[in-house]
Amino acid sequence: MKHIVVKLLAYICYWSGLVSMFYALNKKAKRIVTFHNVIPQNLLPNGKKIGLIDTEDSFDMKIREIKKHFPITNNLNDAKSLTITFDDGYCNEYEVVSKVAGDDVKGIIFISGHLINNNNPTDALTVDLLMHWIELVPNGTYFINYPTIVHRELVCTQSNRKFLWQNVIWPSFVADSLTKGKGLLAALDGAYPMKNILAQCSPEYLRLRLTGLTSDKIKLIRKRGWVIGWHTEEHFPLSSLTNKQKKYEIDTNAPLEMKSIIFSYPYGEYLSVDLESQIIVKESGFPCAVSNLVDPGSINNKYFLPRFTLSDNKYLLHFELSGMKFFLMHQKFLPVYNNPLV
């Protein structure tokens, strides 16, 4: 009911001109938008969006609506333009995006080191394999014997996969800092083989969704005006790691050329990004870093810059991007950061 009321409010504000007014009131605020995967609808396994997914149609709509108010550039110091970013570094993030958006749209891809030159879907980021397991495992009861699992008996039905992800798999993953989730994944594989999970997906889906960019592709993307940034080595929640593990994820394996570029935290919310992680990012030489929150709250600095995740609904998209929703929730305008790359 609440969601319906918000959608109705967004619709009224759009057609009444209030949204346009808030675009003007927030003209000094730089908009950075986060995307993850853009996958053709016909490739989705069982029609499911596993993880953060846009279809080609939903992504195209968002780009068209953005362009009504902003040019799209990679200039983070230009508040008059909007910057689009893509987290993780899977093949679809350039291949499908560039096809849909056209050559005039350039973005920033934040890549996890584990995915560079990785063409093996069974060795994708652990968190993505866990999501595919819980979404595609057949209905039934599975017994998981692993130290960090919060509930050993998994009863999977058609309608409870999101609940199981949020309340069982995700907290069990976060607690598994010793193996960064690989031990948990092996335990699930023992209960129902991962190869059987991925067999439900088409080869083209697996290539686009679960294989990474090659070094040659990264060079080509850069030549075409895109930017490649760092997104840690293995995409594990940083706040759950030791200081040594954090430095490995953030600094040790980061290519030198990426350290002059903005950094993106995996997950990018308060529980996954602690102060120590932000300090390591700064000391490693990155000029700034992005969160996945519109309001960074008390973390008001250029090492936790805000990003928008846009709705698939046109009216909610403008309600959010204009800053009107933010104003109604917080009684203030969007935060302004002057020249974060300086």
How would you label these PLM feature ranges?
Residues T34, P121-R224:
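Extended, charge-rich helix/loop segments that form flexible
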Residues L18-N26, S98-A101, G212-K223:
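Short amphipathic alpha-helices and their capping/turn segments at secondary-structure boundaries
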Residues T85, G89-V97:
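Membrane-embedded segments
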Residues Y90, K99-F110, F163-Q200, W226-W230, ...:
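CE4/NodB-like, metal-dependent polysaccharide N-deacetylase domain
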Residues I39-P40, I116, T232-P237:
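Conserved radical SAM core fold
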Residues E65-P71, D103, S215-V227, L256-M258:
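A structural motif corresponding to the C-terminal end of an alpha-helix
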Residues I116-N118, V127, E257-M258:
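Carbohydrate transferase catalytic cores enriched for Leloir-type hexosyltransferases
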Residues M1-T85, S239-V342:
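C-terminal active-site subregion of NodB/CE4 polysaccharide deacetylases
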